[in-house]
Amino acid sequence: MIGLSEVTRLEEATRALRELDYRSGGEPCLDGVRLCLRENLPLLTAPASEQVRQRLHVAVADLRNLAGWVCFDAGLVDNAQNHFCHALALAGLARADELTANVCYRLGRVFLHHGHFDEALRYFDLGQLAASRSGDGLAAGLLSGNAAWACAKKGAEHSARMLLDRGRAQFDAASRTGVAGWAAFFTPADLSGLAGAVHADLAVTAGRHYAQTAIVLLTTAIDGYDEGMARSRTLGLISLSTSHLIEGDLEAGVEAGLRALASSGPIGSARVRDRFRPLASHARRHRGHCGARELADRIDAVSAA
């Protein structure tokens, strides 16, 4: 019969793997996550008290949630969706609505990254239902902000701004005590980065005047990330570089882009590599500028490696 000690060890292993993912990207985490799943999935069929079983379902659901995110970051979309589906089933068994909301957020992000914006919005809406059942204001703010991002990518300017305002209000009203590991990344710095990403995409789809606000928000986010959030900082630098180029400040755009390239070196993330490609396209529009030309060429070299 298993006890709380086995569940606690699983929770601690998931926490350590999540920290590695934020710091180094999904690719370096794949083997560790797969090993952790092999070692801990048999616990689901072991005898346990009702209290231990409920907590075990949450812990394994969160490990599946992390496995889905790691696979997504590594470019393994089918594997990611499979893990997320298992996470939803286990979170449902445990009636863990806060975790269900987080899994829906991450599923939405998969579709958002791959350009399926309406599907992303559907998952963000499903997540809002779970967040509302649990009264989880932090999850609600995260989901509203990401729905704003999907709308910005679609060019739905009014909806993007309205949803971003709602997300900020929900974040401000949310309790920050006892935040679960799967949601702990959503700090003021991350909210600023998310708002910056919304404005950066609005600068592309709705008007370049959004670039200046994006620059301010992204700079705040980048300055606020600690060393453990290296991937988030790199993604912020990519968006910052793009926003500077759209605004016409080529020197600042090139500087931010080169910083992004330098910081991406130790990070194993297909998602980061994907996000560099639109930046290279923006840089190529300024081939007469030697720095922009160099930035595009260096991104191409990294992509080809």
Where are these regions (language model features)?
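Conserved binding/catalytic microenvironments
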Residues: 2-7, 11-305
